[in-house]
Amino acid sequence: MQTATGPVAMNVLMHGKAYDPAQAFAAIAPVASTYMIVVAGVNQPYDDLAGLAAYSKATPGKVSYASAGVGAVPHIGTEFVNLKLDGGLTHVPYRGESQFIPDLLSGTVSSAMMIAGSALPLIKSGKLKPLAVTASRRSPALPDVKTLDEQGVGATLPLWWGFIAPTGTPPAILDKVNRDLREVLADPALRKRYADMVLEVPPESTPAQFQASMVDEAAKWADMVRKTRITLTAE
């Protein structure tokens, strides 16, 4: 089975979910990772997070951020940025990135945190401008854009995907699938396709290391939800 940042980090926080996915499944291996970019329309009067927060404070109630939905990773991430910078941004939830992009381009909403693969083409074409990247280091595609950490947020918010198995799967099977996935990920053709989609091959990880990483991710996002006081409700 495949999993990602959202299910592992968020489901445990939602009412009605009786299990912690980081404990209910056995980790196999991470297979891809990327980052997000905080963006704004090119006509907005700010170029970084400090400018966004300052403009919001100067125009109370007028500055907003779009998200792909309540409880989505970008929603929690942006709300944490909002909290750390005391930005006073208003959340405007949509049903996915494609739904809010027209409003972001027109200035109907002021900003958004988008997946890099979706945001970069719009940035390169001059339709959006980047304010920050959520990776632990600056993006080679945007070397002049500072990370969240560099702008005082104190957080790194990567996105990742990986494979898991039911709890109780024999360790020998987990190890074998882990090795098989490593071989697949070493393929130069696959790595080129990843690069085209703004994805990275994660460092090699044992099942135990990936399991620990999932637990850490769930704890990190739980802490952000607690600090921002966001309520997540399962349907």
List the predicted regions and their residue ranges.
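An extracytoplasmic/periplasmic, membrane-proximal ligand-sensing/linker region
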Residues: K124, P171-E235
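Beta->alpha turn/N-cap motifs
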Residues: M1-P7, V12, A68, E97, ...
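Short helices/loops that flank or line small-molecule/ion binding pockets
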Residues: F80-K84, S98-T108, G117-S125, M214-V215
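Conserved functional loop/turn residues at catalytic and ligand-binding sites
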Residues: A4, A18, D48, P93, ...
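Short, well-ordered beta-strand elements
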Residues: Q2, A26, K62-A66, E200, ...
